[in-house]
Amino acid sequence: MSFDYEKAMLQGHSFNEYVASVLRQYGVPEVYVPEFTIASTHDAIADKTRNEKDIVVDGLVLEVKSRSLVFNSLDDFPLSSILVDTVYGFDQKLIKPYAYVYISQKTKAMFAIPSSSRQFWTMGMIFDTAKAIEVECYFVTKRHCRPFIELVDVLLERAAQEAEPACE
């Protein structure tokens, strides 16, 4: 059975929409989810890898990673080492994500991995069973991750600072 890229991308996009809706519920302004598209040529796939954005919040890019793992918070996430992104995918991005949002496909619980933790990321190989290939990935430990609400607070603080009139 071959990997169904379109189905996986569509499912991923639905989690982008869900995370964006939660951000809006918390009052985060200027939350935008780009339209869902499928790249079908080699050039289009390469362009999508470089330029795709899951969620944009006032110019900041958030990347959503949905996993079929059960967790209710960062504290009970079942793995000690967390896959951030593929090395190829991250390194090709023209605009690096401000943060990654991890979401459980089972519970909808979330936590954030700030890209400012990049210096603490390590590299390792995984075997992607769905695609039947080995992939080099970036990993981070839980201590460099943050509860989702902390990301919300940072985004709200940024919005409030931008809304304040400039002192003259």
Enumerate the language-model features and the residues they cover.
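Nucleic-acid endonuclease domains
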Residues: M1-V61, K65-E168
